[in-house]
A protein has these predicted regions:
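Active-site-adjacent betaalpha module
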Residues: 1-122
Length: 122
């Protein structure tokens, strides 16, 4: 986050941090405010997951080699079975995205795609 300190694009309560209507939570769904590279950092995500008895995580998002990988690393440390849905992630470059999916993440979690995950959830 060092390069983002002082940035105004992702400030809670501003347009840049607003959840888009197409993915907005439904009534009663939990929203966790992300405060660091990993979704677990300085949040109650781990407690929420444990309380809900959730042991498997599906990760997708922007910045494969940064945010997704950071969250996967901490999820691994916390003992979660983690699946990264690779074709539902993006990064600043295809090279960075591919490197994360082929070099670092396979040591931490399972790499899958949307088609496989959707079929497994049916």
């Amino acid at each position: 986050w060092q390069g983002l300190h002082g940035a105004t694009a992702l400030v809670e309560g501003t347009w840049g941090a607003t959840i888009h209507d197409q993915v907005a939570p439904q009534a009663g769904e939990i929203v966790v405010t992300k405060r660091g590279v990993s979704a677990f950092h300085a949040s109650d995500l781990d407690q929420i997951l444990h309380t809900s008895r959730i042991g498997t995580l599906l990760l997708a998002g922007v910045a494969t080699n940064f945010v997704v990988e950071g969250t996967a690393r901490q999820a691994c440390d916390l003992g979660y079975d983690t699946i990264v849905v690779g074709d539902c992630c993006a990064s600043v470059s295809q090279e960075a995205h591919d490197a994360s999916l082929t070099v670092a993440l396979p040591f931490l979690c399972t790499i899958s795609n949307l088609e496989e995950v959707t079929a497994a959830l049916k």
